[in-house]
Structure formats: C-alpha cells, structure tokens
Regions:
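Short, flexible turn/loop "capping" segments at secondary-structure junctions
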Residues: 1-6, 83-86
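N-terminal interaction modules that seed assembly of large macromolecular complexes
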Residues: 3-59
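Generic structural hydrophobic/aromatic packing signal, biased to beta-strands
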Residues: 11-13, 31, 78, 91-93, ...
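Alpha-helix initiation/capping motif
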Residues: 17-18, 36, 60, 96, ...
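Generic detector of well-ordered alpha-helical segments enriched in charged/polar residues
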Residues: 19, 23, 42-45, 76-79, ...
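Ordered, amphipathic secondary-structure segments that act as subunit-interaction surfaces
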Residues: 37-95
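Glycine-rich, aromatic-bearing surface loops/beta-hairpins
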Residues: 82-135
Length: 135
C-alpha cells in the first residue's frame, strides 16, 4: 500500500467480481482500472485539490477521481474507461491507512505489487488528468 498523503492511500488489488463491489464504492472509496499507480495518485491528488478549491465537477471524491483519471467530464465515459473491472485494479481510499486496511478485509481483496510506468507514459497520464482542469 502506498501512502500518498496522510489521508490518501492507494494499493493494487485483484478483483474477481466487480459487480459485487460496485454498490460499496463512492464517496471516499473508489476502485479504478489504470496502467500504473502514478496516474491514479496524480488524479486522486487533483480530485482532492478540486474539492478544496470548490472547482470539482463530480459530487464525490470517487467520482472526481474517475473524471480526472479519464480526462473527461462525462462520468459515463470515465466509468467505461477507468471504472472497476474484473482483474487488476487500484483501490483508492481518501482516508487513513487503517481505513484502507479495513476496506481490503471488508471487500475480500488481496494486495498486489504496485506497477509503475515509464517516465514518458507517466507524463501522458498527467496531461490527461490535468485536462479536466481546462474543460
């Protein structure tokens, strides 16, 4: 599990039944599909910042994370592109490490090693996440 800030934690997980977990997501918890943890972390930080500044487009941090990660303001498109899927995903908890560990147990998820991207790919993800700032 990677601590991004005191109140933001990300870990890679394997999801066997995405449909079962969807009703449990939202608010301060989201599971997203993405190529690397850096993209997820950057989008999550932008989501937090948008709520602090009152410039958020979504009603929840989880929704804002999705639109930032996808680089679109259309939540349906963001969910289709980066929403939870069966297989490898990232659990994002806008809360304490203890809360994140509690959710791992509650959801029955096992942590996987975090996967990083090469520098050029990370830059591309950062640019896409920042798009929501100017849309």
């Amino acid at each position: 599990m990677r601590r991004i800030t005191e109140k933001l934690h990300i870990t890679k997980v394997y999801v066997e039944d995405a449909e079962k977990l969807i009703p449990k997501l939202g608010g301060d918890v989201q599971i997203v599909s993405a190529e690397c943890w850096e993209a997820v972390a950057f989008a999550a930080l932008l989501a937090l910042r948008s709520f602090e500044r009152g410039t958020n487009h979504a009603r929840t941090l989880g929704g804002e994370l999705l639109i930032r990660l996808a680089g679109t303001l259309q939540i349906k498109d963001a969910i289709a592109q980066n929403g939870i899927k069966n297989g490898e995903n990232y659990l994002v908890v806008f809360g304490t490490r203890e809360r994140a560990l509690e959710l791992l147990r509650e959801f029955g998820l096992n942590e996987l090693p975090l996967t990083g991207c090469d520098e050029e790919k990370v830059k591309t993800f950062f640019e896409k996440a920042a798009l929501a700032e100017v849309l």
